[in-house]
Amino acid sequence: MAKEWGYASHNGPEHWHELYPIAKGDNQSPIELHTKDIRHDPSLQPWSVSYDPGSAKTILNNGKTCRVVFDDTFDRSMLRGGPLSGPYRLRQFHLHWGSSDDHGSEHTVDGVKYAAELHLVHWNPKYNTFGEALKQPDGIAVVGIFLKIGREKGEFQILLDALDKIKTKGKEAPFNHFDPSCLFPACRDYWTYHGSFTTPPCEECIVWLLLKEPMTVSSDQMAKLRSLFASAENEPPVPLVGNWRPPQPIKGRVVRASFK
């Protein structure tokens, strides 16, 4: 069997390029954001979403993350504006987190690591299929939201309560009537740059919108996320933690801010 990628020392991020050479490409994500080097671009528009809660379908544990999957067969749940030239369809969201509250995000801001990072993955329907969009530099738009520790977030608890049904790798459960915009912070300011998926194959097809303001969750809520397993039901238990890729070289890319 081919070596499967993961986050351990033998198959972790420093090995991904062995199977997926683009992981050493010029437009890889995540990156470190150095705010003093980021320019405000007054041409950047506000962004907005119109998500249909009925498009949420399932929640699953694939051994790498927990993912919520949406119906993207037509323009039901859409992201518009910002740096984007047209509307993008929501396909899924997932999270990256650490083994403790002091790290877990993939992007960092002036050296600050957050407890987790939420990625909402959208694709450009002008390319007809998600698979085709993966081959285009503007095929995918990801809204990234940092999670910091503070007071509990009730809307996040809805997601966490579903985790009991997907404790182990390979489990999937219905997850309906959820509008992920309930997780968004009040402030819509963002940074944007061109990058990649942060998991193999690490395709360089992403317009990133990283929100400046994190959402706040409690330490107990983070502990619940870390109660998932990367192992299947019949295997020795392996906790699902530390599923983050460290920042990659920026290689001359420009990060723009929607705010001064």
Swiss-Prot record:
Q: Which residues carry this modification: Phosphotyrosine?
A: 127
**Quick one: a GO biological-process term for this protein?**
negative regulation of reactive oxygen species biosynthetic process
What keyword terms does UniProt attach to this protein? Answer: Acetylation, Cytoplasm, Disulfide bond, Glutathionylation, Lyase, Metal-binding, Phosphoprotein, Zinc
UniProt cofactor(s): Zn(2+)
At which positions is substrate bound? Answer: 198-199
Give the region (Involved in proton transfer) as residue ranges: 64-67
Q: Which residues carry this modification: Phosphoserine?
A: 29, 43, 48, 50, 55, 219
Q: Which SUPFAM superfamilies match?
A: Carbonic anhydrase
Q: In which tissues is it expressed?
A: Expressed in liver and muscle.
Q: Where does it reside?
A: Cytoplasm
Where would I find the Alpha-carbonic anhydrase domain in this sequence?
3-259
EC no. given is: 4.2.1.1
List residues modified as Phosphothreonine: 73, 129, 216
- S-glutathionyl cysteine found at: 182, 187
Question: Where is Zn(2+) bound in this sequence?
Answer: 94, 96, 119
Task: Quote the cellular component terms of the Gene Ontology held in the record.
Answer: cytoplasm; cytosol; nucleus; sarcomere
Q: Which reaction does it catalyse?
A: hydrogencarbonate + H(+) = CO2 + H2O
Q: Which residues carry this modification: N-acetylalanine?
A: 2
- Tell me, in a sentence or two, what this protein's role is: Reversible hydration of carbon dioxide.
Give the family from UniProt: Belongs to the alpha-carbonic anhydrase family.
What is the name attached to this protein's record?
Answer: Carbonic anhydrase 3
Task: Tell me the organism.
Answer: Rattus norvegicus (Rat)
Question: Which gene name does the record give?
Answer: Ca3
